[in-house]
């Protein structure tokens, strides 16, 4: 067994029910934005119970300023239906250079997504700590892309799986098509 109770295989994880954290002390607002920025609230914390309550309410967090968190609910929301996805022949060829794994390098993916040299970077150490806690409880997951035959992490993403939804939070790539 590993952190969060997910049994590991050589290529990733098999599903083990996540651990429900204590409930949040915060009341989540309705999903209607207060202005054109898609922000519905500012404040609260990044405790696991708060994050899960927010996701269940259709909200996600981003830093607002140095100390506060803003809660967003964009309308319309980007949704990628996965049934019927077409992967081109050239992309399939390109993907042969890589190995894809799940939940084997969550912290490394978070750190790569949080790299301050990335344009538009917004992930700070509080978010890394908060989502690492969610990962340890079995709610947050990562997809890692390694160069075939090596241990170099060249791409990945992380997000939260909850109630049949995977909410991708951030991703990075250091190589084409990774």
Question: Could you tell me what each predicted segment is?
Answer:
Residues 1-178:
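N-acyltransferase acceptor-side catalytic subdomain
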């Amino acid at each position: 067994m590993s952190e969060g109770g997910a049994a590991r295989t050589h290529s990733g994880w098999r599903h083990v029910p996540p651990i429900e954290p204590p409930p949040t002390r915060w009341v989540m607002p309705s999903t209607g934005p207060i202005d054109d920025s898609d922000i519905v609230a500012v404040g609260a914390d990044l405790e696991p119970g708060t994050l899960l309550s927010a996701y269940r309410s259709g909200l996600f967090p981003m830093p607002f300023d140095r100390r506060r968190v803003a809660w967003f609910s964009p309308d319309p929301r980007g949704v990628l239906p996965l049934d019927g996805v077409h992967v081109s022949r050239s992309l399939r060829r390109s993907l042969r250079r890589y190995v894809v794994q799940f939940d084997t390098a969550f912290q490394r993916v978070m750190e790569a997504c949080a790299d301050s040299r990335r344009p538009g970077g917004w992930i700070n150490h509080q978010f890394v700590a908060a989502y690492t806690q969610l990962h340890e409880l079995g709610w947050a997951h990562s997809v890692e892309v390694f160069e075939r035959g090596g241990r170099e992490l060249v791409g990945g993403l992380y997000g939260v799986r909850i109630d049949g939804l995977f909410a991708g939070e951030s991703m990075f790539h250091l190589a084409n098509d990774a």
